[in-house]
A protein has these predicted regions:
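Primary mode marks residue(s) on the alpha4-beta5-alpha5 output face of response regulator receiver
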Residues: 1-291
């Protein structure tokens, strides 16, 4: 390969892979660059920190089980995945929490059990048509995630009386739970959590989760503070933090500020509530709004 432009931010963007029938350019961080080099060389790899890669144009792969396959096995077809993010975790990904077969509209593990195991995370939100005939509150909550997640998730609704408990609008079957827009924030911020992230947030302990956890906020969100998880509003002289469509990702041990910024306006994946028990990274999947 040749260098078309020298970069300054530590990320590397790679053109479409000509051997595949689809369009699959990608942009990868430093950990994923090491992963990519090891994969290309067929070399051993130790994933010693989280990694993030973008494939927002989609992609196609020859196999979900063999990292070295150059074409699909006899009788099989190329695997096509729409716009997605790829994630690395030092502990890998638990097949009890994520599918190990390709999915168009929910996260799945690629190359499970190999040194190159990673999570494929589709980021196309459910369409209005796919939601079906549901209430406005259900529609808002379901807008947080892709169809494969939200159609089978537990959907929570706001309390019917002031000070009451949230109500269940839909009983789920896939372990995910989706919450409605927070009335206390000025933005629209429904979210869908997998079992790991939901338990981590509920316990106030996202840095000590037993394995990698994931949340969707594809409708975007707004937060009081990027440093204080207990803030009840923005600090004096500051404004609400608005983040467009994004993922939230947590891993055991949290994230190192040497590799991820804490600047919520950077446009890069950034650490929210760094150094606290609720630390996680926010991964924008569209351009950040400019102030």
């Amino acid at each position: 390969m040749i260098v078309l432009r020298e970069g300054t931010n530590g990320w590397t963007c790679i053109t479409d892979w000509p051997a595949s029938p689809g369009n699959d350019p990608m942009c990868i961080d430093d950990m994923f660059a090491k992963w990519n080099d090891a994969l290309g060389a067929g070399a051993p790899l130790t994933v010693d920190r989280p990694g993030v890669a973008y494939m927002l144009a989609g992609g196609s792969d020859a196999s979900n089980t063999d990292p070295f396959a150059m074409a699909p096995a006899a009788g099989e077809e190329w695997i096509s995945t729409p716009a997605h993010v790829m994630l690395l975790s030092p502990g890998g990904f638990d097949a009890a929490n994520f599918a190990a077969t390709p999915k168009q509209d929910e996260p799945y593990i690629m190359w499970d059990g190999t040194p190159y195991e990673h999570l494929m995370v589709p980021v196309v939100p459910i369409s209005q048509e796919a939601m079906g005939d549901v209430s406005a509150e259900m529609q808002n909550t379901m807008s947080a995630g892709p169809a494969g997640i939200v159609k089978n998730a537990t959907i929570m609704g706001n309390p019917t009386v002031e000070g009451g408990e949230m109500v269940v609008l839909q009983e789920g079957t896939n372990g995910w739970i989706c919450y409605p827009d927070r009335a206390v924030s000025p933005g629209n911020d429904p979210q869908c959590n997998d079992t790991i992230s939901d338990a981590g947030f509920a316990a106030g302990a996202t840095r000590t989760v037993p394995s990698a956890g994931l949340s969707y906020m594809l409708a975007g969100g707004s937060d009081e503070s990027n440093t204080d998880p207990m803030a009840s509003g923005p600090a004096a002289g500051e404004e609400w933090i608005s983040t467009p469509s994004h993922l939230m990702f947590m891993v055991p041990g949290g994230f190192d500020t040497k590799f991820f910024t804490t600047d919520h306006m950077s446009g890069y994946p950034y650490i929210m509530w760094a150094g606290t028990d609720l630390e996680h990274i926010m991964i924008p999947v569209v351009d950040m709004p400019m102030e």
